[in-house]
Each structure stands twice: as C-alpha cells, then as structure tokens.
Amino acid sequence: MACSVVVALLALLSLSGLEAIQHAPKIQVYSRHPAENGKPNFLNCYVSGFHPSDIEVDLLKNGKKIEKVEHSDLSFSKDWSFYLLYYTEFTPNEKDEYACRVSHVTFSTPKTVKWDRNI
C-alpha cells in the first residue's frame, strides 16, 4: 500500500514537472500545391514542437485575420511536445500577402511568418 502511494506521488511530481518545460513552436507556412495565380489552393500553417499546449494561431491576408480557417486536433509527439495544422482555401495572386501569426508563452510578442510562394 505504501509503495503504491509513493509511486502515485512520484507520477504526480513528474507530471507537474512537465508544466515547467517550455518549448517555442516551429512555424511553417506553405501551400498544398505549387502556387499559380488565379488557381484555388490551400494555405497551411503547421505549428510544431511547442509546450505548453496553450497557443493562438491566425492566418492572415494582407495583415488581416482570415475568418474561415479550419484546424486539426491538438496532438502530441513522442517527446510530449504539441503540434497543430491550420489551413484555409485561398486563391493566390500577385498583390496579396499571406502569413501565419502565432502567440505562445515562449514569445514576448506574437510571431508572424510570411508565406513564400516559391517554397
């Protein structure tokens, strides 16, 4: 009985230690298909390797938040870091700029990564 109590306490201590670990998210912005002006595509923002799980992700068009955005369920890797995919349909052209803005406890201000149509 005492042994199981000790094991339970050690498990709780190790889980509470996970809260202290913080990892900044890696942000990747890319289109599903090679960009062609006037041709519908999907804009993706893949955010990975972050901890804790609280995060805010916005896709932007010309600096303004895109409202119709979908995302995957929050998932975690073998190292207990988290990852998410945010995506929306868009039609690239010469004038519009697209980006992904991420707010996380590891950033003092939100980080914005622009979409590079050549990637």
From Swiss-Prot:
Disulfide bonds join 45-100. It comes from the Eukaryota. CDD domains: IgC1_beta2m (cd05770). Coiled coil: none annotated. It is found in: Secreted. Keywords: Disulfide bond, Immunity, Immunoglobulin domain, MHC I, Secreted, Signal. GO terms for biological process: antigen processing and presentation of peptide antigen via MHC class I; immune response. Pfam families: C1-set. Residues 1-20 form the signal peptide. GO terms for cellular component: extracellular region; MHC class I protein complex. Residues 25-114 form the Ig-like C1-type domain. InterPro entries: B2Microglobulin, Ig-like_dom, Ig-like_dom_sf, Ig-like_fold, Ig/MHC_CS, Ig_C1-set, MHC/Immunoglobulin. PANTHER family: BETA-2-MICROGLOBULIN, MHC CLASS II-RELATED. Heterodimer of an alpha chain and a beta chain. Beta-2-microglobulin is the beta-chain of major histocompatibility complex class I molecules. Component of the class I major histocompatibility complex (MHC). Involved in the presentation of peptide antigens to the immune system. Belongs to the beta-2-microglobulin family. This is Beta-2-microglobulin. It comes from Mico emiliae.
